[in-house]
Every structure is written in structure tokens, then in C-alpha cells.
Amino acid sequence: ESDRYTVLGDPTEACLGVVAQKAGIDTTNQINLTPRIRELPFDSRRKRMSTIHNLSTPIGGCERIAYIKGAPKEVLELCTSINKNGDKQELSDSQRNEIMEANDRYARNGLRVLAVAYRHLTKECNLPKSLSSYTPELIEKDMTFVGLVVMADPPRPEVKDAVELCHRA
């Protein structure tokens, strides 16, 4: 069995799918259990994207969940708690600093880093019934930090020529 994967579509999404599979998560089953019902697309100002999913089995009365991924600093600013071994705890300043220090270490080594977080969308959130009314301002707050995803993101082949051109300039 090869340890290489062939993927179609967005490379970041594909990488996250491979990571999930290597962690023992049945991604097909997960997609069926939590179908995506809305996406708040990535934009360069927010430096993140969010997806909203229905839960086939409500968790504590919660029927929907939002997931967010993006630049660690920006995602971390939206988090008020952290998931530690399945236990939701308040996110402390020292934990924030540790996370950003880890991010900086990875980035200095040329690795691409994404932060991942979630939020259970409960009735107390007072969200509108219409999914089209779900905005980043309503969804992307009070998040629970899950972790950092670190990827080797090699430069595109055309980068070598661009760098050489810059050196000759």
C-alpha cells in the first residue's frame, strides 16, 4: 500500500481530508453525519472561511455547528475556549501565546499553518431562520479552538523563474 494520495479539487481541502483519514476519521461518514448547509467563503480581509453544518444527532440541543479555518492570528482572536482532549475550557492568554509561538516556529521553517475552531450554534445564539442571513459577524465569534494544521506547501514551479528574474533585475 502506497502512502501517496491522488486528490482532486482544492489542495488545502484535500490536505485536510488526508490528515483526517490518517487520524482515523471516516470522512465519508462524517460528511453524511454533518452535511454542509452554508459556506462563508474565504476572503483576504478576514483571512479565514467558515462552513455551517447540520448535525444528524443533536449535541445538547444543538442542531448546527460552524467550523472555521484560516490564519492562526485571525482565528485565535475569535476563540474564547479551547478543546483539550474533548473537554471545552476557557482559553487563557498563556495558551494563546503558546499557540502563536508554535505558529511562528512552523512558519519560520517554511511551513504553512492554519488554525481550526468550531462553535455549536444553539438556540441561545438567536440566529435567523434563513441560512442566507448567516454572516461572518453572526457566526465567527465565541469559537472553540481545536488546533493548528501544519502543511508543507512547496512553491509552484513558476516561482523559480520569477525569483531568478528578480535577482537579475
Please report, for each region that a protein language model flagged, where it lies by residue.
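Cytosolic catalytic regions of ATP/NTP-dependent phosphoryl-transfer enzymes
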Residues: E1-F145, M151, P157-A169
